[in-house]
Amino acid sequence: MTLLISGFAVPLTANATNQPAAWSAEESELAPVYISRCIDASIQTVWESWTTAAGIRSFFARDGVVEPHVDGEYSVLFFPENPPGLRGAEGMRIVAIEPSKRLVITWNQPPQFATIKEQRALVEYRFRERNDCGTEVQVKHFGWGQSDEWAQAREYFRGAWETILDRLEYQYEHGPLDWDNVPDHLWYTGPTAAATDASN
């Protein structure tokens, strides 16, 4: 069967998704990581926590750079005293921004994943007002590759984003984090073997 569009005959096939044959389910990337949390704060306050350098320092990392526009820099510096390349999410870029609604940024991989460290995935934050809790923050980390190292990075971030949202909650309850005295439960070094086994 063909469809005539502006004088061109376009064949219609049974593949309604128009998915190329080479892009099979077996070869597709790892599933996104989804995390959400209700935060007892206004949407504007939560938005500023993610989109200002002062906000980044209050819960996310010791230092940060935010240029809140498309293609602006978004750096989250967990170890600002380290040499370049070992300080955190350095030189990431804002891909999309809708004030108080949505922020999409590129994201690199931690240094322990050496062969993919400079590869970029994407992180999307969404913000939604809720009557029962204040603001819902949704995190989607996606765009993973297909190797075992990508799978390990995905597992790492699954736990990391939970910890980051724990920090966000904590700073609204107790004030900005003191980076020289962070409670033990707000540190994250990677998934435990038990957590990794449970996710498989």
Which residues are covered by each model-predicted region?
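Hydrophobic ligand-binding cavity/cleft-lining segments
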Residues: 7, 12-65, 198-200
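Intrinsic-disorder/low-complexity, polar/charged segments enriched in Ser/Thr/Lys/Arg/Asp/Glu/Gln
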Residues: 30-36, 73, 89, 102, ...
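Short beta-edge strand/loop motif at the mouth of beta-sheet-based domains
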Residues: 34, 54-89, 187
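Hydrophobic/aromatic beta-strand elements that line small-molecule binding cavities or substrate pockets
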Residues: 35-37, 63, 89-96, 120-129
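A short, structured loop/turn motif at beta-sheet edges
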Residues: 43-44, 67-68, 95-102, 126-136, ...
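Hydrophobic pocket/interface hotspot
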Residues: 46, 56, 74-76, 94, ...
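Beta-strand/loop substructures that line and gate deep hydrophobic ligand-binding cavities in soluble
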Residues: 113-159
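A conserved amphipathic terminal alpha-helix motif
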Residues: 143-200
